[in-house]
């Protein structure tokens, strides 16, 4: 089993996967990538590069093989690994760098800092890489507070030491204090402590060289809430040696040798990181609290770990999940600044729901509309439709007026009722027997031959009723077979050209009779002028043909 000292990561139990548990899915791929980025032996395989949070996979096959070994999947390859990395795109954990092969970038600004592991931070002797993640501080630490405040840890037990080494309690506690002083009075908070237990502006050189007393803390260490080894992973990693491969820079506070702020990573923002970005106003050094711990000793910025403070602390952690889009490095929690709680969005939609419900019955009953008139939206009536509203207003108005005797509403309704009946006449005119139509048309054609078209002047007398007939004639013509329609048109064209097709005169007349018979007698009152012209042309061509035969 891999020891915590080998990894150097402060994973909790749910995020740490030892190699001795095959098939376990507790470790995530991006946790594993952070592990590889921190180890010196894998610098030729994967390394930080380029912009802030960016890393390049130099040997994709080797990274996939290592991931397969870790997950007990020997068939792992880079294709499967890249699909797993693409899964993190929507999670806003990392994304692919465009234009660069095998290059990805962690979204440390968008990451929910509660969800990614805190990389153990030591004294980096070398230069900080440009792509290093942000400096973790009071609010951005990977912390898991104790589940119950009843778990009490003795102040002499070193939470960062193995349980076997906790026998000499006083020496271990002194070592903890000395180690914290050596890294600039900053705690990684994985041991359940807060970095604000120590004064921010105090010069570490003013402290005695020996083991510091308990009075060096602003509050008694007995007030610290404990942590369970099941909740926090205990790491006995020494803090004295330099860690040039750590992606985090040196402590954000002043080191033992100077009072000036340290040199930060060039990828960090310009906001003052020496001020603790904490999840609760009580943790902020600007919080004007009068008392310190439960014993009353200490300055104003002491986090006493009282039940009230812990309640606010846990509430702030749950709130950070809802406000994950806010960067904890760029959002200072001031005492006067009120951050909306997670339950407020549930209350916000309630006020608009009240005015939305009354307008629905307002259209049905006048009493409800009068009661809800002050809450009615101006833009709500138009979506109902102007025609529907007009019809709704006319319907009750017409009934009232008809009962009163005015009759104006009845006329409007009558006009609306008269409009639809026009289609029935078209249906009644269509069914006409062919025999009757042929007989009628035969007599008409015989009259044309005898009286030279005189008979067509008498039917023109009634022009009033045939007005709807022009709409009927095309409808009847559409019902006519295409063959007869084109034959009739061809015969008329031939007649207009001057008798070029008179060789089959009787047959054409017979066909024309059939076509005219299909049209029906009702058409005689409609298109009279073209039929008269065609008859005149027919007689003229007949006379010309007789003259040619005689000659």
Swiss-Prot record:
InterPro entries in alphabetical order: Ets_dom, ETS_fam, WH-like_DNA-bd_sf, WH_DNA-bd_sf
Modified residues (Phosphoserine): 20, 24, 185, 190, 327, 433, 437, 446, 534-535, 551
Alphabetic keyword roster: DNA-binding, Isopeptide bond, Nucleus, Phosphoprotein, Repressor, Transcription, Transcription regulation, Ubl conjugation
Skewed-composition ranges (Gly residues): 289-301, 404-413
Gene3D superfamilies on file: Winged helix-like DNA-binding domain superfamily/Winged helix DNA-binding domain (1.10.10.10)
GO biological process: chorio-allantoic fusion; ectodermal cell differentiation; in utero embryonic development; regulation of transcription by RNA polymerase II; trophoblast giant cell differentiation
Residue span of region Disordered: 130-169, 184-304, 342-476, 495-551
Residues that bear Phosphothreonine: 3, 7, 443, 529
Covalent link (Glycyl lysine isopeptide (Lys-Gly) (interchain with G-Cter in SUMO2)) residue numbers: 467, 483, 514
Keyword DNA-binding: yes
GO CC terms in record: nucleus
Expression sites (tissue/organ): Expressed along the osteogenic margins of the developing calvarial bones, in a similar distribution to that observed for the master osteogenic regulator RUNX2.
Ranges of compositional bias, category Acidic residues: 433-453
KO phenotype (gene knockout): Mice fail to undergo chorioallantoic attachment and labyrinth development and die in utero due to severe placenta defects.
Annotated Pro residues bias: 239-250, 348-361
Subcellular location: Nucleus
Bias (Low complexity) ranges: 251-268, 362-373
Record family assignment: Belongs to the ETS family.
Function field: Potent transcriptional repressor that binds to the H1 element of the Ets2 promoter. May regulate other genes involved in cellular proliferation. Required for extraembryonic ectoderm differentiation, ectoplacental cone cavity closure, and chorioallantoic attachment. May be important for regulating trophoblast stem cell differentiation.
Name the UniProt record assigns to this protein: ETS domain-containing transcription factor ERF
């Amino acid at each position: 089993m891999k020891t915590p000292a080998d990894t150097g990561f402060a994973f909790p139990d749910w995020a740490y996967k030892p190699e001795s548990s095959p098939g376990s899915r507790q470790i995530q791929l991006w946790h594993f990538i952070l592990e590889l980025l921190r180890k010196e032996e894998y610098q030729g395989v994967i390394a930080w590069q380029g912009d802030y949070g960016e890393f390049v996979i130099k040997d994709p096959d080797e990274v996939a093989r290592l991931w397969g070994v870790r997950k007990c999947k020997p068939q792992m390859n880079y294709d499967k690994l890249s699909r797993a990395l693409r899964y993190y795109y929507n999670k806003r954990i990392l994304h692919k760098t465009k234009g660069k092969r095998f290059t990805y970038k962690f979204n440390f600004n968008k990451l929910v800092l509660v969800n990614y592991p805190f990389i153990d931070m030591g004294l980096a002797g070398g230069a900080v890489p440009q792509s290093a993640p942000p400096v973790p501080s009071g609010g951005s630490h990977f912390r898991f507070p104790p589940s119950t405040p009843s778990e009490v840890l003795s102040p002499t037990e070193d939470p960062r030491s193995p349980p076997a080494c906790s026998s000499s309690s006083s020496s271990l506690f002194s070592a903890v204090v000395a180690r914290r002083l050596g890294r600039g009075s900053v705690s990684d908070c994985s041991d359940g402590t807060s970095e604000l237990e120590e004064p921010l502006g105090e010069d570490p050189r003013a402290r005695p060289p020996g083991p510091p007393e308990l009075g060096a803390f602003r509050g008694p260490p007995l007030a610290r809430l404990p942590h369970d080894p099941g909740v926090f992973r205990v790491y006995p990693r020494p803090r004295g040696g330099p860690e040039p491969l750590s992606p985090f820079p040196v402590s954000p506070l002043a080191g033992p040798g100077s009072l000036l702020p340290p040199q930060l990573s060039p990828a960090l923002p310009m906001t003052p990181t020496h001020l603790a970005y904490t999840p609760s106003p009580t943790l902020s050094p600007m919080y004007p609290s009068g008392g310190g711990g439960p014993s009353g000793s200490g300055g104003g910025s002491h986090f006493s770990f009282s039940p009230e403070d812990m309640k606010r602390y846990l509430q702030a952690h749950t709130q950070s999940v809802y406000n994950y889009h806010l960067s904890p490095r760029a959002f200072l929690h001031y005492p006067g600044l009120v951050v909306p709680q997670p339950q407020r969005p549930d209350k916000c939609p309630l006020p608009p729901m009240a005015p939305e419900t009354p307008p629905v019955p307002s259209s049905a009953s006048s009493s409800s509309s009068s009661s809800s008139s002050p809450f009615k939206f101006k833009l709500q009536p138009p979506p109902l439709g102007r025609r529907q509203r007009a019809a709704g207003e006319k319907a009750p108005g017409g009934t009232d007026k008809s009962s009163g005797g005015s009759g104006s509403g009845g006329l409007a309704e009558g006009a609306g009722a008269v409009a639809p009946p026009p289609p029935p006449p078209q249906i009644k005119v269509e069914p006409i027997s062919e025999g009757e139509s042929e007989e009628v048309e035969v007599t008409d054609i015989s009259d044309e031959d005898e009286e030279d078209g005189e008979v067509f002047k008498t039917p023109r007398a009634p022009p009033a009723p045939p007005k709807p007939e022009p709409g009927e004639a095309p409808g009847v013509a559409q019902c006519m077979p295409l063959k007869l329609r084109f034959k009739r048109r061809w015969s008329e064209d031939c007649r207009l050209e001057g008798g070029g097709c008179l060789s089959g005169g009787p047959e054409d007349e017979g066909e024309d009779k059939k076509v005219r018979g299909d049209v029906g007698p009702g058409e005689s009152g409609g298109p009279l002028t073209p039929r008269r012209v065609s008859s005149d042309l027919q007689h003229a061509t007949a006379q010309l043909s007789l003259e040619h035969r005689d000659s």
